[in-house]
Amino acid sequence: MALPMIRGMKDDSVEPVQKFFESNSFDAWEFDLFELEVLTKNHSLWFLGMILFEHYKIVDIFKINTNKLSNFLLHLESTYQYDKTNNNPYHNQTHGADVLQTTAHFCTTGPIQKRLRVIHGFAVFVAAMGHDYRREYADVVYMQILYISFFLSFV
């Protein structure tokens, strides 16, 4: 698999990432996203997005400009968190990459793989990447308070 490169990334930085993907299937349940996050210097979402869109021919079928895809993924990564000062330890670009990788796993195993078309893969990968994009809240307690207040307003 030809590994894409982020603009400005040095060749010696790409080599460990290349070795990682040569020995780890991106759709395997055992995939170590946190190792990828370290190797890519917090760009696991970008690498997985580029690789999945190329591997499943989404780029070719939908005639997606890879520079625009790259820019989209870089923007998604850099703006994923709503409030960077909050440093939400869960709803961040790493979580988006984790859900993307897990989604790829489920799309390629079991009965779902026989029913999926490329358009479905396109939609589900974009949804997986951005499902918590700029999410303001971090925990269940916040949501419970929010929804309790909301429902009490109708009583």
Q: Could you describe each region identified by the protein language model?
A:
Residues M1-H91, C107, Y142-F151:
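Non-catalytic interface/linker regions that flank or bridge core catalytic/transmembrane domains
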Residues R7, R115-R117, R134-R135:
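Arginine residue identity/basic-tract feature
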Residues S44-F47, T94, D98, I119-H120, ...:
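Generic recognition of stable, solvent-exposed alpha-helical segments in well-folded globular domains
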Residues I51-H55, T102-F106, D132, E136:
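Generic, well-ordered alpha-helical scaffold segments in large soluble proteins
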Residues E77-T79, T102, A127, A138:
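Structured beta-strand/turn binding interfaces of compact recognition modules in eukaryotic regulators
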Residues N88-T103:
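Active-site-adjacent "gating/activation" loops or surface patches in catalytic cores
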Residues T109-F122:
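Short pre-active-site segment immediately N-terminal to the catalytic Zn-binding motif
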Residues H120-V155:
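Divalent metal-dependent catalytic cores for phosphoryl transfer on phosphate-bearing substrates
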